[in-house]
Amino acid sequence: MPRSLKKGPFVDGHLLKKVDAQNEKNTKQVIKTWSRRSTIIPDFIGHTFAVHDGRKHVPVFVTEAMVGHKLGEFAPTRTFKGHIKDDRKAKRR
């Protein structure tokens, strides 16, 4: 169920402060964050966020198409190595 429109999108306060400070200074430094739950808003466009995926920070450059999505959607947490191939020689013995 989506979030109520009267509440607006959720963005962590510390993240919003960092983006506003960079917008005032006209700088574009990487913003390191653990807040995967924050919704991307139009103020974030053009900024790069280092989103934590559980072991490292993944750089995410925000574009217009990402507005409305969560930061965590662009930093996958699981790595699929593939299924192990069946080794028939080892089974025959």
Swiss-Prot record:
<keyword id="KW-0687">Ribonucleoprotein</keyword>
<dbReference type="GO" id="GO:0000028">
    <property type="term" value="P:ribosomal small subunit assembly"/>
</dbReference>
<dbReference type="GO" id="GO:0015935">
    <property type="term" value="C:small ribosomal subunit"/>
</dbReference>
<dbReference type="InterPro" id="IPR005732">
    <property type="entry name" value="Ribosomal_uS19_bac-type"/>
</dbReference>
<comment type="similarity">
    <text>Belongs to the universal ribosomal protein uS19 family.</text>
</comment>
<dbReference type="InterPro" id="IPR023575">
    <property type="entry name" value="Ribosomal_uS19_SF"/>
</dbReference>
<dbReference type="GO" id="GO:0019843">
    <property type="term" value="F:rRNA binding"/>
</dbReference>
<dbReference type="GO" id="GO:0005737">
    <property type="term" value="C:cytoplasm"/>
</dbReference>
<dbReference type="Pfam" id="PF00203">
    <property type="entry name" value="Ribosomal_S19"/>
</dbReference>
<dbReference type="InterPro" id="IPR020934">
    <property type="entry name" value="Ribosomal_uS19_CS"/>
</dbReference>
<keyword id="KW-0689">Ribosomal protein</keyword>
<protein>
    <recommendedName>
        <fullName>Small ribosomal subunit protein uS19</fullName>
    </recommendedName>
</protein>
<dbReference type="GO" id="GO:0003735">
    <property type="term" value="F:structural constituent of ribosome"/>
</dbReference>
<dbReference type="InterPro" id="IPR002222">
    <property type="entry name" value="Ribosomal_uS19"/>
</dbReference>
<comment type="function">
    <text>Protein S19 forms a complex with S13 that binds strongly to the 16S ribosomal RNA.</text>
</comment>
<dbReference type="GO" id="GO:0006412">
    <property type="term" value="P:translation"/>
</dbReference>
<keyword id="KW-0699">rRNA-binding</keyword>
<keyword id="KW-0694">RNA-binding</keyword>
